[in-house]
Amino acid sequence: MKIIIDGDSTPNKTEIIETGRKHGIKAVIVLSTEHFSEKLLDSYAEAVLVDNRPQEADIKIMNLAKAGDIVVTNDIPLSFMLQGGKVTVINSRGMTVSKKDMRPGMEIHHEEKKIRRSGKIKRTGIRGPKKYSEEDKGNLIAALETAIKGI
């Protein structure tokens, strides 16, 4: 088992690595060269660098993830793709993502993308997520602990 972190979209990488270390589980941080920081690396954290091209990190994560692994990502399409592989997917707010939860999220993501690409509407009126909080960080660590103990 390993914890794979989508390094381009996930905050609190250090806390995720520490949680893995506590249980003897290594973390693999997949990130573009643009987001790399040596501060994250130690004997329990390995960086896998990818080119700074669209979906490059997502493809690498899909190739690395095996049954029993935990992936931490905020990427909705990536979460959806990982559902078939018996991988536990957790977002940075501590929500464990399931396939049945994903369908509405994927539909919304697709519609928003179509609106943005059309260029007809500059602002969709859709707001981004609320500010990341200490409660969110606590939920993330709790979800990781639960996933580690449950596998």
In which residue ranges do the predicted regions lie?
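Nuclease catalytic cores that cleave nucleic-acid phosphodiester bonds
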Residues: 1-151
